[in-house]
Curated annotation (Swiss-Prot):
Protein name: Protein three rows
Gene name, Swiss-Prot/TrEMBL: thr
Species, as recorded: Drosophila virilis
Phylogenetic lineage: Eukaryota, Metazoa, Ecdysozoa, Arthropoda, Hexapoda
Keywords, comma-separated and alphabetical: Cell cycle, Cell division, Cytoplasm, Developmental protein, Mitosis
Function: Required specifically for chromosome disjunction during all mitoses; maternally provided protein is sufficient until mitosis 14 then zygotic protein is required. Involved in formation and/or maintenance of epithelial structures: bud extension during Malpighian tubule development, and foregut and hindgut morphogenesis.
Residue numbers spanned by region Separase cleavage-site: 1065-1071
Subunit: Interacts with pim and Sse. Cleavage of thr contributes to inactivation of Sse.
Main location: cytoplasm
Domain of life: Eukaryota
A Gene Ontology biological process term: Malpighian tubule morphogenesis
Amino acid sequence: MSLGDVKEQLRGSRTEAKNAAKLIQVQFERVRNGGTTSVALRALKYELNILRQLCCALQENFHQHADIYCDIAADMLPHVAPHLPQPDYWVNHLMSLQYIHHALCREQTIKQCQRFYELINAQSCQMQNKSEYKYYIDIHIRHVYFFGHQLGKQSAASEAKAQLCQALQALGKLLENMLQLKAEQNEGYSELMGELNQLLGKRSIGYLKNLASLPLTAMNRLWKPLFKLIACNGGTTDQLNAQFSEYLSALLALLQLDDNVWQLQQSEAQAQTPLSLQLLHSCRELYKNQTAQNNVLQLLYNYLKLLNTQSADLKRSYIDLAKKFVHFFEHKAVSHVQEQWYLDFLFVLVRVQKHLHQIDNKVPSLERFWQCLGGQDSATAYAAHFELLQCLTSRVMKIGRGSPLAASCSGNDASCPSVLKHCVFTLGCCATVAYSSWQPEAQATLPKASQLCLASIIHYAIDVAKVTKCLTPNSSELVTFAWYLINMAEKVTTATQMYLLEHLLKPLQELRPLLSPPYAQQLVRRLFKASAHSSNPELSALLHGAYIVSMSCPARQFQQLCVFYHTPKNDTEQCLLELCEKSPLCSPLNATEKRKLYELDMLAVLANKKTPKLLQSLLRHCQTDYQMVLLGRQMRTDKRSAGQQIEELRVRLQRLGRKQQLTRLQQLILGHATVTKLLEAAETQKIKIHIKEMTEKTLEVLLVKYKLFDLTISSEMPLLELATTAIGAFESFYEQADAEPLSSDEALIDWEALIDDGIAAAMALSTMGYIPQADNAWLLLLRICRLLGDRFNYLRALSHFLPRYTQHALFDLPAEVSHAEQLLDELWPQLHAAHLLKRHHTTVLLCLCNLALYYARLDCVRHAQLLLLHAQRLRLEFEERAGKCDIIQLTIQTVRFRMCYQQRHCRSLARLPTALQQLDTLTESVRSFTCISSMDNGALILLLGDMVRDTTECTANRLSELPNFSNSLLQLLLQSGLVLRAVELLISWLWTNLRMECLDKAHSKLRLIEHFLGMQPLLESRAALEQTSNKGSLTLAPMDAQSKHMTELVGKMLVMQLEQSGACVEPIRKQQQLTMSSPRRELPLPSARPKLQRYVSLDMQQSHPMLRSSVQLQCIYFMAGCLHARLYFLNREHEQLDDFYALANAWLQQNAARGNALGHMLLVLHIYQANYLRARRRQQQAIELTETALKLAGSEQLQQRIDVNYRYNLLLQLRTAQLELEPPSKPQNPRRALTFNISPEEKLPRPVRKVATASKKPAKFAIYTEDVRPASSTTSSSSSSSSSENASSPERKSTKSKSPKRLDLNACQLIDIIDLSDDETEAVVQLQPAKSTSALSTRSTRTRAQRQPDTLVAPLRRTATAPNPLSAEATPKTIGTRARARRQNTAEQPTTTTTATPKVDSVSSRRRHRN
């Protein structure tokens, strides 16, 4: 068969390939047994031809017959040998073997590869010359490389390891044969290291790691002959210079291999010299004649040897060696800087440094070196190390070209043009690793010069990182560098360590954009932590600000901002944005980021550190109008900063709002700006008035002294408009939330500021007394606080409604009360929590008190008392409130007072003191008031305003005087310019003056009211009064002796009467001695008198728009008119009263809301009108009016919030009018005089009895008594108060005694007493003296009750019982008068009084019967 047939059969089917193999075997045996001298050559040629055919077949991918090919090779290889005369045949033979082995090194033919490699190793290594070793080396290296990768596979690991060991042993044998051949031929292997670098220097780290896992015994069979061969290998200078880089490349590979061996086989590795040192030792022998190369190899050998040894003198040796390197580079290497071997050595030394610092290794093999280098006295060694790194950095930066041995790009880009930059960056990483791995205690000992050296190295690394394109945020080199920088900052514990970082801040700012966000944020965070050890507070603040800016979570940013402003060292007066402009590490921010950061910064400043300079810094950097108004809220005391800007903004928004609808954000801005203007205007109008000047007689003088002529209701309207505008803007912002949502990108809404300003506006409305507008404001706050979950402000808003309403037209008050009770159940057990302030305590306790009043008006009296008791007990748990009269104690007393005098069910309040006793306690509590929380003063003004109204109603219906706190309240109101509240107080005061018939004082109050209401200026009123006084003083006649005597007589009788009355002084109006013969002052002419109609028919064209639309203000005018009409009635001036009452009734019928707004004053109007009708003999009209008023008083609308005595007064009015319309048929008998306050029902006819025998007992006048039991207030107080309301006003006429002699007060004579009529023309029965006898005088000292046992006796009081200790403690008894003291002493005795029919026509009783 020809060669061509064999070729076809080898590429054919498997059977054909087997047939070809048999045929080849037969033919090869035939050739080998030819018997000629050329048999060996012919066999070699035949074998070479067959190997070529196998190479061609494998090249054409016929690997399925690889086992047959190996059989063919196995038959021929043992029988061929080199032919010396023709060496090319053997070379071709080796080339064919090399090719076949390469072709079989694949996954499909791995078994055949192993078999073929074993066939090659089974033959002896026959080399004819030094060049043939390359083919053997290539085969072995190829086999090691292929099975080195197979070693990573677990399924073939053991078999691959065996093959690698076999290959290394075969390679060692080859090197031994080469040593033998070199000894025979004396020729060097100049290219040997380049061939071996195919196995070592040009392979990956993973491949070298696989080799390191082989047994050291197998590896040593390769390295020992290799190092011997290198040491004895020679060559020319050019050859050695050319091979220098190859040796250095092998050195780098062996360094890596040593490291891997140390990690995998540490115990075995420690027992032998590292391979890298053995290589350097052989290279020193090789380059012993090359001085320059020998020097660098010697330095490198000593350096690596020092790294792998442990000695006590390591630090000193390292310092000396580092100095030798520096000396070499600065002096000896100057002449070689352009030579390639020098560049290669320089880059190798850089990579040795990288290997030394173990940047790429997770398990450092040179840890022993760093342990020996560190410890005590290591600062000098580290300083030498940093000096060496700086020297290398400076030399690398001066290199003009690169080297293949330079550190490769992290992206394994062979074409990376930044090789030199990578080297500089690597040295910077090495310096960072060395310093960060050093002990923190030792870092503090590094000299500042060495710190600057280290800083320069890192600075160079950052400079090249900025311009190196392949250093991306995700590159391993940059990530490693950033990690060690973070570690450096983390270990800072002293100011010395911080000194280094201070010099790195500017370079780190340039590095920050190159880092990924997590590493950049972590770096800034560690620098901020390290700044705690800095001696520069400003730098610490800058770094803290940079850290806050680097955060991405707004919640964490705000938290850190609070920490920033609470830091004791931080005394900066600059906002965060201003600090960012100076900070060395703050990244640039876009407009959106700046706005969000500014809003967070502003919120943190407002919550933690509101210093003027810091607020001004924020104001300089504000970006929106909303931010400006939020700052303006905090700078309201500094008008120069933002006041003008905010006012201009408010005016601009108001003008814009007239043209178009404002957006939600604009409405919010307008609301804040308006509140700022409101508070500024309220503060501007405040004045200072001394309390000593606030007396009832000098009020008009006070207004003139302080020039309060412009203080009228019109002057208060701008404040009212500002407050209502602000609330309207806030309401529009709240109501349009769904229609116009706001994102956080537009504005970060400060709801706390909105609630605070809303409360400010609502408090302004409440303090000024405009209740409808205040209701709208507090209702808005109620809804907002419930939506936001602001529990305390929700309870504060609800507390506005609880004392005033049980139902409200604008919202479901019972549902809100139910929700508030749930909040109170949650809050009151937590009141002692540390985070709660005193105002929070006040809010909860006030809500409990007001809730008690709410339930009391719903007739849930017991529940109300329990709530008050609970509030009292909670109050006593706070040390700062115990023993003091705070707003809570005052409110509890006020609620109990209201419950007492407004309660219809007396038995439920049986153990409470009477209303007048509680009123004395309230007076003392106001005098001793103590402010505890920030909201107490505002709550006190509101409480006093309501208290004046309630106490006036109570005392007026009980014939008592106003408590003493009116002066103090009026002082506060006038100082604050609160006109409407002042008018309400003056109206209450006027009511009391009219009730006490102090007409001069009433005239004074009326002039003040008219001035404040803008009806008549005070100066005009006083001028008219002076003219009238001057004219009236001319008509006064001198008092004769008899008139003086009568005056003294009446005065003594009144004194005796008051002394004998015991405990009944307080319910009776304090008496005044009157001049009997003094005529009335002449009143102005009817044409000059003010018209009452002006109080009802207001000039709507000239009045303020708020007045035209405000029912409350109209009712204020109306009440003033009612009291003015009462003053006319007391002065017996009836000309305008008919028209006024007709207009009043028509005015009330026009709008039902007016009657609701008047409240109890509507009943007072009916009582006054009934008095007038009775005085005009219109009893039937009076009866009809009184019956209507009784129905009104019993309605659900009024009965829950008025004095209970109104009903009794109206009943007495009705009964009196009925008696006057149908007088009793029986004549009235004379009775003893000086029996006062006999109601119409008690005026029963009695038979006249003869005068009894004389008695030595003194005269005793028992009118009625009043004990401490509160349940009886509905009888005696009503009877006493009603007695002053049930009679018409008669004409005052002087009474003269018919006898010219002086009367003997020791002999009281029996006189006839008749009831005074309302008709002025009715004849007045004068006092008729009876027969004067001594016995009669003696007997006359006894009362009718003593002389007539069958007289009807009516007990007015139940026996007083011991008061409740809790209620007594909550409402202590404060005795205001001497009579009150007597009443307490006689409280245990039940008192009776007799009913009498005749009326006494005495001077002392005439004023009381006028009502």
